[in-house]
Amino acid sequence: MTDITQILTDLIGFPSITPEDAGCQKYMIQFLEQLGFTCQQLNNGPVSNFFACYGKIGPLLVFAGHTDVVPVGEVSKWDTDPFSLEEKNGMLYGRGVADMKGSLACMLHMARRFIKTYPSFPGRLGFLITSGEEGDEFNLGTPYAMQKLEQQGIVIDYCIVGEPSSSLKTGDVIKIGRRGSLSAKIHLSGKQGHVAYPHLADNPIHRISPVLAELTSMQWDNGNAYFPPTSMQITYIHCGGHAGNIIPGELNLHLNFRYSTEQTDESLKTRVINAFTHHKLNPTIEWRLNGEPFLTNKGILLESCKQTVLEHIGTLPELSTSGGTSDGRFIAPYGVEVIELGLVNATIHQVNECTSLQDLNTLETMYFSICEKLLID
């Protein structure tokens, strides 16, 4: 068993189903403190967070990630114990091996090797870790930790988020940004009545239908060189009882935007409200901004990562903003150069989640090389 797989074995053994950390961060903190890192816990309710830093002056490169994992689903469908790392034919199985305890193991191993190789390097190396990335408690995680760091005057120059960015092999895709995410819960009141007497009722389904037709056919924007066009999806509609002879008296609807840098949350809100106003409706709308879009399309970090990937796999990486949101959205607004570089995402959140030993070794070597370029060269 290699050093990386031993670290990964230890991390997988903690059943850290979001937002529970289950001991992962205690393990990581002890590991880093033994290397000379200064660590501070930034826990917030059920979510565990910590920041660790090695070095006193110079540019600060932070590796960010999360210790929480999604639920395993039906354990009987797994070929292995999801919380016990198992190797089969060069593949490593367990919940979180790809998303993203494999990256965490690479980060820890790289940090130990880097400090042993360069004990007095002219810069700072950091870790920003949360257990609140996978669930609804994300606001208690990285956003909270970043606020605390700002209050302490800690400024991050570069950040590598270890999310599983890769498609076929480690490094073939680097995420240089993510779309924004805006959700809305809409409530529209009508008047319940008998279907035989519609003139005595007010059907909210009929009232909202032209609004939905307008919103679902709307071209929000054309995207740009880095982002696809903004998309709106209706995710939930509920209209009360199940009786076939009752006109419902109320309607609840949820929708979500994934939006490009061509929009802001306020511009989207305005267009939704205007659509309702145009049809003389005044619903109650509860908005939730899950994250603004961010983009790192240039800079020292990106160039270092591109060159590193080219050196290790022989091709330049695809630069992408596809996929869901990540905690990079909470770090970039502080003026930080942010990219995502991690393992292959083909099996994340699935039964029999896995990664290859080769990909682990490649990722650790890439992390080491990037540190050399940013903190040594």
UniProtKB/Swiss-Prot annotation:
Q: Does the keyword Metal-binding apply?
A: yes
Named in its record, the pathway it takes part in is: Amino-acid biosynthesis; L-lysine biosynthesis via DAP pathway; LL-2,6-diaminopimelate from (S)-tetrahydrodipicolinate (succinylase route): step 3/3
Which amino acid positions bind Zn(2+) 1, per UniProt?
A: 66, 99, 163
Q: Pfam families from the xrefs?
A: M20_dimer, Peptidase_M20
Any S-S bridges, and between which cysteines?
Answer: none
Biological process terms from the Gene Ontology for this record are: diaminopimelate biosynthetic process; L-arginine biosynthetic process; lysine biosynthetic process via diaminopimelate
**Which reaction is catalysed here?**
N-succinyl-(2S,6S)-2,6-diaminopimelate + H2O = (2S,6S)-2,6-diaminopimelate + succinate
**A molecular-function term among this protein's GO annotations:** acetylornithine deacetylase activity
InterPro entries for the chain: Bact_exopeptidase_dim_dom (IPR036264), DapE_proteobac (IPR005941), Peptidase_M20 (IPR002933), Peptidase_M20_dimer (IPR011650), Peptidase_M20A (IPR050072)
User: What Gene3D superfamilies does this protein's entry cite?
Assistant: Zn peptidases
The alphabetized UniProt keywords are: Amino-acid biosynthesis, Cobalt, Diaminopimelate biosynthesis, Hydrolase, Lysine biosynthesis, Metal-binding, Zinc
Q: Which domain of life is it from?
A: Bacteria
List, from the UniProt record, the residues annotated as the active site of this protein: 68, 133 (proton acceptor)
Record: residues binding Zn(2+) 2:
99, 134, 349
- EC main class here is hydrolase
Q: Which cofactor does it need?
A: Zn(2+); Co(2+)
- Give the record's cofactor note, including how many are bound: Binds 2 Zn(2+) or Co(2+) ions per subunit.
The EC number(s) attached to this protein equal 3.5.1.18
Question: How does this protein assemble?
Answer: Homodimer.
The entry assigns this protein to a family as follows: Belongs to the peptidase M20A family. DapE subfamily.
What the protein does comes down to:
Catalyzes the hydrolysis of N-succinyl-L,L-diaminopimelic acid (SDAP), forming succinate and LL-2,6-diaminopimelate (DAP), an intermediate involved in the bacterial biosynthesis of lysine and meso-diaminopimelic acid, an essential component of bacterial cell walls.
Q: What is this protein identified as?
A: Succinyl-diaminopimelate desuccinylase
